[in-house]
C-alpha cells in the first residue's frame, strides 16, 4: 500500500461528510502529466450498446467529467456502437438501478447510502430519482435487447 495514497484520501475525506472521498487522486494524476493516447481506453472499439452512467456528486472519482470525455471521443471518432451518456446531478458513486440495490440490500438501503455519501443525505429524493431513472432506462434497453435477440433467433 502506498502511504501517500491513503494519506491523501484521509485528508480529502476529513470534514467532507462522506465515509470516504478520493477524487483528489484522479485530479492530481491528471495534473501530474499528460496522458498519452496509448493510455486511453479506445471506447470507440467497443461493440454493442453502451450506457455511460454517472453523477456529478460522485465522491470517489470524477465520473461526470470522464463520461463527458468518452462522449466527446465517440462524437469525434468513427464507431459502430450505440451509446447513451447519462450524467445526473445527484446519485452518488452508487449510480446503480434501484431494483439492483434493493436486492443487494433489502433492508436499510437509505440508511447505508446516507451514512456513506453526504450527497445521499443532502439530496435523498434526487438520488433515489436518479436510481429509479437508471432502472427504467436499463430495464427498457434489456427488454429491447431480449426481444431483438428472440426475433433474430426464433429457433431458440
Residue ranges of predicted features:
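Mobile cap/lid helix-loop segments that gate and shape the active-site cleft of serine hydrolases
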Residues: 1-41
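Alpha/beta-hydrolase-fold catalytic nucleophile elbow
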Residues: 26-29, 53, 88-89
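Active-site rim elements
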Residues: 36, 56-59, 122-129
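Surface-exposed acidic, glycine-flexible loop patches that form ligand/cofactor-binding
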Residues: 39-45, 147-152
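Short beta-strand/loop motif that positions the catalytic acidic residue
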Residues: 46, 51-58
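Acidic catalytic loop of the alpha/beta-hydrolase fold
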Residues: 56-61, 92-95
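Conserved strand-to-helix beginnings and helix N-cap segments that scaffold or border functional pockets
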Residues: 63-67
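C-terminal catalytic histidine-bearing segment of alpha/beta-hydrolase fold enzymes
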Residues: 68, 76-156
